């Protein structure tokens, strides 16, 4: 979901005193590719945002539609170009093992991302989380997530591609968060998939 503009400005305003006091250097945020336009970028520049990461996930329009992402590869290209034009640091986030996505599809996504010239990327494996549509598909046998080994091998090949083009890989895999672990009872919310707490 995209935050309302008023809420965005409220949150960004709260950080400004820390930037003025040099306690915080800059702001980094993640958003959907279809949330980026010139007006938003003007506003983000005003609030000292330096890095914008786009949740690309895949560059295959069929896979994006299959996963109900709500954006297209055209949205990714347009947003990436605008972000670079406005001189923000551009980051991309991609996922490996999306429904109907093959290793070839994931490699192609990495190659497409390279052409868009982000400074950094994050690579996340798809996990089946409790209470999601993907859990329903998994329970019906309509989705099989990657194993840890498959995710590592696939990610390894993708990391090599990025490193050959001097694009920093700043994360591979998800960090342990309240989304993954129920904060009250510390039970995992992960039903299946290549999750390793390391």
Can you say where each PLM-predicted feature lies in the sequence?
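Conserved non-cysteine loop/helix-boundary elements of the Radical SAM core domain that shape
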Residues: 1-120, 130-149
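Alpha/beta-hydrolase-fold enzymes
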Residues: 142-164
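Structural alpha-beta junctions
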Residues: 23-25, 161-167
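Flexible glycine/acidic-rich beta-alpha junction loops that bind and position SAM and/or redox cofactors
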Residues: 96-103, 120-146, 167-197
